[in-house]
């Protein structure tokens, strides 16, 4: 009995020391800095207490070597990795690739042993130089989108060689081993064409399953971005387009549940309804919904942009079979996730013993708390609490929850925040949007519900009316 008590106490002690049994992996995108006004987001805006792992997206590749993409990546790398000074348990990774990167550079790199070795050597040097703890491979996708069938096996070879090189480097440098993870497909045909699941799972630390973009305007009818379950009426391949099916497919085909990280989107897909009175799931559509004022991409709204849509009178509904919400107003329709659906999915994740959650992306959450009246980072915080992520010993940043107030026209010292007075000043009577400031090319007016906010581009950039964005002069 004494031994049993001792063992039980030891297990409890280990659980306390190790923290949560789950991981919360949060992507940050290096183009979020270019969003206007309150949407602009940089590493300093990240709360380092929310996630167990942060991933910087994206790096590129030239001549089979990892490279920066943005002009200020090196500066942002430092700010990103400095977040570990405020959370000693935080791990940071650098993601390479992404959808827009395509497949050709990966195909060339994996095609020969020499090319792979060139890549691996450059990765180790790069990660150590800039202070990252690992590499996230975002090849979308091996064996698809122009990638030849042999890349399925060569991807396994690459991951195996990366893992072995990381292990050897850790011994030689007497430093913790660099992690190797991958963001992988949710579409069954892409999974089958791209991944040797049992073999890959031996070498990857985490498998980040991109369980979103399961429906969009490309379908020609409304659908949820990331439904937990299928609709009762869905048959054939449509019955595969849900989080539950995809995650269990990976598990049933050889991936350990504890390495599988479930994708959670902090954005929604928008549609134009063909008939504004037909508003349910599966309603005919005629294309993408309009771009949001911050993310500026047709068919796509950040969570905080969705909150504005809801606040402006959209009808909200709950898709009970799929455990996710949708909303509509006029001919605009959005399928998305909210606090309730994140909570439901987190409980399902725990019941199925998956390794944790991955969010795309932390810069799409309501990080200022200005849009949704749910506090700062409401979606990410929901997962943090649901997965029992420890925050002891971590120092959160003090983000402003409202724009810094300065009289319209008086200017400010830079940054992305301005201010104004309700119903007065430049924006009185004007439509919501961004407007140039006549005597200051670095500044712009941001009008929201008649309220005037003067905001500034980053130093060296000017407000460009052709794109309503900050651009090089």
From Swiss-Prot:
Quaternary structure (record): Interacts with EGFR.
PROSITE patterns with a match to the protein in the record: CHIT_BIND_II, GH18_1, GH18_2
GO BP annotations listed: apoptotic process; chitin catabolic process; immune system process; polysaccharide catabolic process; positive regulation of chemokine production; production of molecular mediator involved in inflammatory response
SMART domains membership: ChtBD2, Glyco_18
Enzymatic class: hydrolase
Record region (Disordered): 395-421
Residues engaged in binding chitin: 70-71, 97-100, 141, 210-213, 360
Native source organism of the sequence: Rattus norvegicus (Rat)
Annotated catalysed reactions: Random endo-hydrolysis of N-acetyl-beta-D-glucosaminide (1->4)-beta-linkages in chitin and chitodextrins
A Pfam family of this chain: CBM_14
MF GO annotations: chitin binding; chitinase activity; endochitinase activity; kinase binding
Active site residues according to the UniProt entry: 140
Gene that produces this protein: Chia
Protein name in the entry: Acidic mammalian chitinase
Enzyme Commission number, as recorded: 3.2.1.14
Signal peptide boundaries: 1-21
Primary localisation category: cytoplasm
């Amino acid at each position: 009995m004494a031994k049993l008590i001792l063992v039980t106490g030891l297990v409890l002690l280990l659980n306390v020391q190790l923290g949560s049994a789950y991981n919360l992996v949060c992507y940050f995108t290096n183009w979020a800095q270019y969003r206007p006004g309150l949407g602009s987001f940089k590493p300093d805006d990240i709360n380092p207490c929310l996630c167990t792992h942060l991933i910087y997206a994206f790096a590129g590749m030239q001549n089979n070597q990892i490279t920066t993409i943005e002009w200020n990546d090196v500066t942002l790398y430092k700010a990103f990795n400095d977040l570990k000074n405020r959370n000693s348990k935080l791990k940071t990774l650098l993601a390479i690739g992404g959808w827009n990167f395509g497949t050709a550079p990966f195909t060339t790199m994996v095609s020969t042993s020499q090319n792979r070795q060139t890549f691996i050597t450059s990765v180790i040097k790069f990660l150590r130089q800039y202070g990252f703890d690992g590499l996230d491979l975002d090849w979308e996708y091996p064996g698809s989108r122009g990638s030849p069938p042999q890349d399925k096996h060569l991807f396994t070879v690459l991951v195996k060689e990366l893992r072995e090189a990381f292990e050897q480097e850790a011994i030689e440098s007497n430093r913790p081993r660099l992690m190797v993870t991958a963001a992988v497909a949710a579409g069954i045909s892409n999974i089958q064409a791209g991944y040797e699941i049992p073999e890959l799972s031996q070498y990857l630390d985490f498998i980040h399953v991109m369980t979103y973009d399961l429906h969009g305007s490309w379908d020609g009818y409304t659908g949820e971005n990331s439904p937990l379950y299928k609709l009762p009426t869905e048959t054939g391949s449509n019955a595969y387009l849900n989080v539950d099916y995809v995650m269990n497919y990976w598990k049933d085909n050889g991936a350990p549940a504890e390495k599988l990280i479930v994708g959670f989107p902090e954005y929604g897909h928008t549609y134009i309804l063909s008939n504004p009175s037909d508003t349910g799931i599966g309603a005919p559509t005629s294309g993408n919904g309009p771009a949001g004022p911050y993310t500026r991409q047709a068919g796509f709204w950040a969570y905080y942009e969705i909150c504005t849509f809801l606040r402006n009178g959209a009808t909200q509904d709950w898709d009970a079979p799929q455990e996710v919400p949708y909303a509509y107003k006029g001919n605009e329709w959005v399928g998305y996730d909210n606090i309730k659906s994140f909570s439901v999915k987190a409980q399902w994740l725990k019941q199925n013993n998956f390794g944790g959650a991955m969010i795309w992306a932390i810069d799409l959450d309501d990080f200022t708390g200005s849009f949704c009246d749910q506090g700062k980072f409401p979606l990410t915080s929901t997962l943090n609490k649901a997965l029992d992520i420890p925050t002891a010993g971590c120092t959160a940043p003090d983000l402003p929850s409202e724009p810094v107030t300065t009289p319209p026209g008086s200017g400010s010292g830079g940054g992305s925040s301005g201010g104004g007075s309700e119903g007065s000043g430049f924006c009185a009577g004007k439509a919501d949007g961004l407007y140039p400031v006549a005597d200051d090319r670095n500044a712009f007016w941001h009008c929201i519900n008649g309220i005037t906010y003067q905001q500034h581009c980053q130093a060296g950039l000017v407000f460009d009316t052709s794109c309503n964005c900050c651009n090089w002069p």
